[in-house]
Structures are given as C-alpha cells and as structure tokens.
Amino acid sequence: MDKIEELKIEELKIEIPQRKTKFFHDSENSDKRDEEETLNPTITSKAKILIKSKNFWIETLIFVISVFGALCVAFGIMLIGFLLWLVSNTISILYFIKQKQYPLSLQQMVFLITTCIGVYNNV
C-alpha cells in the first residue's frame, strides 16, 4: 500500500476593507454616526435620500390619488372615483414619459382608453 502524505494548507487571511458610506466624510463624528445607523436601522441613509427625492413624492401622489379613486368606486361614489382615477392615470402617463419608461406609459394609455370605452358603453 502506498504511503499517504498529508498536505498542509496554510490559513488564508482575507481582509475585507471597511466600506465608508458616501454620506459621511472622514471626521471624528463619522464613527459615531455609523454606530447610530447600526443601532437605529429604522431609517437608513438611503431611505433618507429616497424620501427627499422629487420622484418619491410624485409616485406617492399618484399612488394616493389612485387608491382614493378606487375606494370611491368601491363604495359607490362613481363620478368622484372615476375623476380621481383619471387624474392619477394622466399624471402617471406624463410621469412615465418624462422618466423615459415608455412601456409603462403605453400600459397606462391602454388602461385609460379601455376604461373610457367601458364607461361610455355602460352609461
């Protein structure tokens, strides 16, 4: 029987560099801020930036108007519900065109046309 040789593998030490966030500059307080973010993960720095963006508020406005429109239709307030939905859909179309999200704008246009045809045929 052949002699079995043992292979010794040296331990590999891989150091992963600490990633500094781009929101804090190197200062005495940066470690303290990093610790605070770690201890309080409810609102991260990315979430703070998202909330401050104009797109966030436009998308939230579209969402709120369309939900209120849907609730109005669900509870039988048809005219107000349809008008709220129409406003929301129009804002969506314009917003998606501005953001160059053409498939979504086309989808909203098709929804607008089919809904208007449905309202016309059922009134």
Swiss-Prot record:
Transmembrane segments: 67-87, 104-121
Cited InterPro entries: NMN_transpt_PnuC
Compartmental location: Membrane
Alphabetically ordered keywords of this record: Membrane, Transmembrane, Transmembrane helix
GO molecular function term, any single one: nicotinamide riboside transmembrane transporter activity
Protein's organism: Invertebrate iridescent virus 6 (IIV-6)
GO cellular component: membrane
Name of the featured protein: Transmembrane protein 049L
Membrane topology recorded in Swiss-Prot or TrEMBL: Multi-pass membrane protein
